[in-house]
Amino acid sequence: MLEQVCQLARNAGDAIMQVYDGAKPMEYARKQDDSPVTAADIAAHTVILEGLRTLTPDIPVLSEEDPPAWEVRQHWQRYWLVDPLDGTKEFIKRNGEFTVNIALIEQGKPVLGVVYAPVLKVMYYAAEGKAWKEECGVRKQIQVRDARPPLVVISRSHTDDELTEYLQQLGEHQTTSIGSSLKFCLVAEGQAQLYPRFGPTSVWDTAAGHAIAVAAGAHVHDWQGKTLDYTPRESFLNPGFRVTIY
């Protein structure tokens, strides 16, 4: 099933690129929570939703662009969790740092994850405790790697006082910034050692990257030390968290 989901992510990426390259209008707007949405978000959502319903008709889908009501999903034990275009701000800025995120959740845990960056033509994916990176048709297994001083990856679009204070207290380190779920993937492939997050995220922002990071040997915990949990709850918001190899 993993390969079929990877192909779905590629197809969604193709739909996004039609808008990104100007073949279709962007039609940029704002949602109720003031987050941006484009025609590319909707196009990718449609591709993934139709594909997953064909691939696994018995597994429900929670997508950022059409989340079912709480009453519908409150008893879900197994479901797909999708962000058709993670990093819409990066898409609008045209810096290429946006991704397609698809995760399979079982009993609150992300057991399969796919993150595809269509501009960069890089795919990360994980299942059954193993993680891979595919680039230019070449696939390699990835795992975390220690480095001193550690490289800390932070959000390109979201900074806050809590993060600034945390970094000041961290000790010797280097920082880099990148958009979307690629932060999880940098830790997973050994390029970075820590991704701290204080600002708001939603479950669809993190689940696929979470699966990949954990399969590569990282830990994804909230600031109380608990593993991020995707058991259905009324709010889609995550607590603050960190992705770390330590």
From Swiss-Prot:
Mg(2+) 2 binds at residues 83, 86, 205. It is found in: Cell inner membrane. It comes from Salmonella typhimurium (strain LT2 / SGSC1412 / ATCC 700720). It is a peripheral membrane protein. This is 3'(2'),5'-bisphosphate nucleotidase CysQ. HAMAP family: CysQ. Substrate binds at residues 64, 85-88, 205. Its cofactor is Mg(2+). Induction: Strongly repressed during nitrogen excess. InterPro entries: CysQ, CysQ/Inositol_MonoPase, Inositol_monoP_metal-BS, Inositol_monophosphatase-like, Inositol_monophosphatase_CS. The gene is cysQ. One of its GO terms (molecular function) is magnesium ion binding.
